[in-house]
Design a protein with these regions (language model features):
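Catalytic domains of carbohydrate-active enzymes, especially glycoside hydrolases
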Residues: 133-158, 251-257, 333-336, 405-410
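Active-site-adjacent "subsite" loops/lids of carbohydrate-active enzymes
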Residues: 112-127, 184, 201-249
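The substrate-binding groove and active-site-proximal loops of carbohydrate-active enzymes
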Residues: 118-127, 164-177, 227-241, 278-286, ...
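Conserved, mostly hydrophobic/aromatic
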Residues: 148, 194, 243, 250, ...
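Active-site-proximal loop/short-helix segments
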Residues: 157, 164, 204, 209-211, ...
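Aromatic-lined carbohydrate-binding/catalytic grooves of carbohydrate-active enzymes
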Residues: 143-177, 267-269, 273-274
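Aromatic-lined carbohydrate-recognition surfaces of secreted/lumenal glycan-active proteins
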Residues: 121, 193-203, 259-260, 282-324, ...
């Protein structure tokens, strides 16, 4: 439905745009002043259907060329011929901008009605676990939580819905836990914003089946492994296409947003790691962000937004931490970032605290403020907060730190174990 609305809107916009661009005021006056009376020419009737940007541009070119045939002035014909290339570029840009506008409409509507995105992670493997479902539903019905983050592609390389992506037939990695109808049924609990978590460049199954697409260990002569994790080469076109295809299908299940996790290089200085492109700052940042840019365009065309999970320290580190995550670059290519500002993950002494985990409010405030001090729009930052190894009071302090900075927030707990007292009750 979103796609249809986008197409209808683009046709209307295109028509208005052509009338203005093809016949600017000075040209209309010039035509009217011509001594030769232009013959009546019936404008060809063209049915314009826009299933893709490529077809869209073909139709525009066809329409423009037919208008050229109706012009008798050689001066005018040359003028329009020179403009043709510029028109195509401008219309393509307009099409993408309006796809972005439409992708943002539902989000903006939700934010207006609910003020904040307040979410918890729901482990996709547990989607059909009755006890877990009841626990999550209780959180949703009794507290101000209004958002769920649900796995569609996991750290193990499993895809949790029925997919038509080609590589799945080789990988045998479907572990179906939910359908489109079941995702839609979640909204019967309450008005929810739904985010699909998709693990990107960490995939043991893909790395083992397609070793040429993985980060390679030249010492062991096999795909590089780090603590049991296998990383894919971010520059691989095959890997990128695989991920984007999964993301598009996940969007069509009814999710509002796709969230990329492990959108990075391995966090290791292992000298035996080998990549298709030189492992330096420029290549890392370019490979990550060109992929994000491509993904966002595809997802906006489907009506979904794109976010990226990042390490918390990139809010403070002004380089890329050796993993391709540079703050200023990455925020330009996604709709939101979710830095994982878990106090327990900061080293002793961070932000002046010997034990950061004991100071959740202060540590999270300091980390997020570092990003704001670098000029990052607070509306682009939606942190993942710590929902593990913390008391209910600690979790509330995590939330308070984000809320005091007027930021949305998500809570991470790998087992999706949450207690009502960690959140604001609806009656409060």
């Amino acid at each position: 439905m979103k796609k249809v609305l986008v197409n209808i809107f683009l046709v209307a916009l295109m028509t208005s745009f052509l009338l203005i661009i093809l016949y600017p005021q000075d040209t209309r006056e010039e035509i009217q002043s011509e001594e030769t009376i232009l013959p009546d020419i019936e404008t060809p009737k063209i049915t314009i259907y826009i299933p893709s940007e490529e077809d869209y541009m073909k139709q525009i070119k066809q329409l423009t060329e037919r208008y050229d045939l109706s012009l008798t002035s050689s001066k005018q014909a040359a003028y329009y011929d020179n403009l043709l290339g510029d028109i195509e570029i401008q219309l393509n840009e307009i099409a993408q901008k309006n796809a972005t506008i439409y992708a943002s409409l539902e989000f903006n509507k939700f934010k207006k009605e609910h003020d904040e995105i307040r979410g918890v992670y729901f482990n996709g493997y547990l989607f059909n676990n009755l006890n877990k479902r009841e626990s999550i539903e209780e959180i949703l019905m009794s507290t101000n939580v209004n958002t769920l983050v649900i796995d569609v592609k996991t750290d193990n390389g499993h895809i949790l819905f029925d997919t038509d992506v080609e590589e799945v037939s080789y990988l045998n990695n479907e572990r179906v836990k939910f359908s489109k109808n079941e995702i839609q049924d979640l909204r019967e609990i309450k008005d929810l914003y739904l985010i699909a978590r998709l693990v990107v460049f960490q995939d043991p199954l893909f790395a083992k089946f397609f070793p040429d697409e993985a980060v390679f260990d030249s010492r062991l002569n096999k795909p590089y492994s780090q603590n049991g994790q296998f990383f894919l080469d971010p520059s691989s076109e095959k890997v990128q296409n695989y991920i984007v295809n999964i993301a598009v299908e996940a969007c069509r299940l009814g999710f509002d947003e796709i969230q990329y996790d492990y959108i990075r290089y391995p966090d290791s200085n292992n000298k035996f790691m080998r990549f298709d492109t030189k492992n330096d700052f420029e290549n890392r940042v370019n490979n990550i962000n060109s992929f994000l840019s491509k993904s966002r365009k595809m997802l906006h065309n489907e009506g979904c937004l794109l976010s990226a999970d990042t390490f918390g320290y990139i809010l403070t580190n002004k380089q890329d931490g050796g993993i391709g995550q540079n703050l200023e670059s990455i925020v330009e290519n996604v709709d939101f970032i979710s830095p994982m500002v878990y106090p327990s993950h900061y080293t002793n002494g961070s932000f002046g605290y010997q034990n950061p985990n004991k100071h959740p409010y202060e540590v999270i405030t300091a980390a997020l403020t570092d990003a704001l001090d670098r000029g990052i729009d607070k509306d682009k930052i939606r942190p993942f907060l710590q929902g593990f190894w913390h008391s209910n009071e600690d979790i509330r302090n995590n939330i308070k730190a984000a809320s005091d900075l007027k930021m949305d927030w998500l809570i991470w707990n790998i087992l999706s174990v949450y207690e009502l007292d960690s959140f604001s009750k609806l009656s409060e």
